[in-house]
C-alpha cells in the first residue's frame, strides 16, 4: 500500500487504473493489473463504468493546479520584490513624490456609466474629474470623495476625448465625439454647453488645449486632419492636412510650439504649430498608434542617457523626446529627429494610453491586457511594476492629476531667454492618477 495514500484512496486509484485501461481496450493489461492488485471479479464491468474518466479528470486537475501554483509563485516573487524596494514605515512620511508609484488597489472605483470609458481628464485646480464614454455621456466626479457630481449630455455618439483648459479664470472643458463635433462646457456655470464646434468631416478622436492657460484648442480626426480652434469665437483658425490616415491622438508640447500625432498609418509625426509643417516622422510601429505624448523636461536627463547623449537638452526646450503606444503591443521612445531610442516590451495586448510621471523617472502605460505598467527610465526603461487586473476589462486611458502651481507654464513663451530651466523641473505635485476601462468604471489611485 502507498505510504502517501490511505487504504481507501489506494483502492480508488487502482480501480480508476483498471477503468482507464478498460476504456482503451487494453484487456491484457487489465487482467495483469487485476492479478497484481488482487482485485477480483467482484469489481464488475458495471462497477468499472463508474470510474471511467476519473483518472483523466484528476490528471487535468493536477495540470491546472500546477499552472496556478506557478502563476501564484510568480506573483509572490513580484510582490516580494516590490516590498523589498518599498520605503520603510519610518521613511514613508518623508517619501520623495518623484518615486511615487500607484498601489495595487485603487482608492476609488467610480461606476455610473453604461458603456466603456474612453477618456478621462482632471480639472487643473479643483478635485473634479471628467470621464467620457461610449454611452454618449460625460460624467463629472469629485475624485477626492469618490462621488458623482453631475452628468453632461449633448453628444449623440461615443465621447472620444476630453481636456480642461482655457484662459486664466475661465477654465473650460472640451469634449470631442464620433458625432463629428467638439463641445465646450463651462464649469463655472454648472457645465453649461456654451459652444459646439463644427468642421471635421469624420469622427473626432482627440482634443487638447494647446497650452494650459490659452484659448487655442487642437483636435485630431479620422478625416486625416488636425485642426486648431479659437475657443473664444468657435472658429477654426488653422487646418493641418496630415496626408496620412485616421489620426488617433494628438499631444502638444508644454510651450505650445509643437504637436505630435499618431494614428492608423502606423507613424507618428512631429509638427511645427506656427507653420503647420512636419518636422519629423517616427517610423517603426507595426500597427495603429493609439497614443502619443511628449516627455516632460524632468525626463530629459534619463532619456538623454538612453539616447547616448553626453548631456541632456535644456529644460527650456520642448519636444525633445516622444513616447508612443500602439496595437503592436509595444511602447516606443524617440528623439525629436525621429530616431528610435528604445522599445519597451511587456504588454500582451494593445497599448491604449501613456503618461509620464511628473518626476520624470517613470513612464506609465495601460492597455487591453487590463494592466497598468510602470517603466523606469533610469534603468533603461525596465518594467519595475505591473498592476495586474487594474480593471476587469480593457484599460483604455490614463491621466495624471495636474499641479495647479504648474499653470504658470502657460506663459513660458513670454519668459526671457535667460530664465533657468528649473521652472520646468517639477518639485512638488499631486500623486494621483485616474484610469478608465471598458468595464465602464473609472479608478482613482492615490
UniProtKB/Swiss-Prot annotation:
Source superkingdom: Eukaryota
Which GO BP terms, alphabetically?
cell division; establishment of mitotic spindle orientation; microtubule sliding
Q: Where in the cell is it found?
A: Cytoplasm, Cytoskeleton; Cytoplasm, Cytoskeleton, Spindle pole
Alphabetically, the GO molecular function entries are: dynein complex binding
Give residue ranges for domain LisH.
9-41
WD repeats: from-to residues: 112-153, 155-195, 199-239, 242-281, 284-344, 346-385, 390-430, 432-446
Sorted alphabetically, the keyword list is: Cell cycle, Cell division, Coiled coil, Cytoplasm, Cytoskeleton, Microtubule, Mitosis, Repeat, Transport, WD repeat
> PANTHER family, per this entry?
TRANSCRIPTION INITIATION FACTOR TFIID (PTHR19879), TRANSCRIPTION INITIATION FACTOR TFIID SUBUNIT 5 (PTHR19879:SF9)
Q: How does it assemble?
A: Self-associates. Interacts with NDL1 and dynein.
> What HAMAP family does the entry give?
lis1
Job of this protein: Positively regulates the activity of the minus-end directed microtubule motor protein dynein. May enhance dynein-mediated microtubule sliding by targeting dynein to the microtubule plus end. Required for nuclear migration during vegetative growth as well as development. Required for retrograde early endosome (EE) transport from the hyphal tip. Required for localization of dynein to the mitotic spindle poles. Recruits additional proteins to the dynein complex at SPBs.
Entry note about domains:
Dimerization mediated by the LisH domain may be required to activate dynein.
Q: What is this protein called?
A: Nuclear distribution protein PAC1-1
Q: Origin organism of this chain?
A: Uncinocarpus reesii (strain UAMH 1704)
